[in-house]
Amino acid sequence: RFRNNSSGEEWPAQRKIIELRDWLRSNKFKKRQALVADLGGEVTLRSSIYQNENGSIRAQILFLPLANGTINHCLSFSSETLDNERLITDNLNTPYGGFYPENWNVCRKPWTRSAARLLKSHQKRIQGLELEAYEIDPVDEINQQQGVLERTNIEAGFLVPPHLQDELGR
């Protein structure tokens, strides 16, 4: 689970990542929250959440630690419609084996490294839809969505229920 990152370590000091932060700011995305999640074995996943002016698009930047000590990053744009459809456009390059909830519409573009092109693709997907402004705290929203994703995959038989994981694994 994610929690607030109060350590001050948020944006890695890498040119491309700093350029992404500046791009978000210049495109009127405002920082909402810095988050961190412990993945075990001293591996920490950091994330920064930004939101556009009217609150209809959230940007989540994931900072992924690599074995060689460098940091990779992925970007995800998400929006929700008034009828509870969740649209996600991201460039995550890690495989996902599992199921998404029926109201999620996910578009993966792992080869799109340009934030501008990824945002343009997301804006095309949400054009003409009635969007709901995000008001929930990012850490709460992300953890809720993670719970929804886990439940969906437990119900589909892809993941083992938590009470059986010690015996059977995840």
Report the location of each language-model feature.
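Alpha-helical membrane-targeting segments
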Residues: 1, 169-170
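Structured extramembrane domains adjacent to transmembrane segments
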Residues: 13-169
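Transmembrane-cytosolic junction motif
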Residues: 1-15
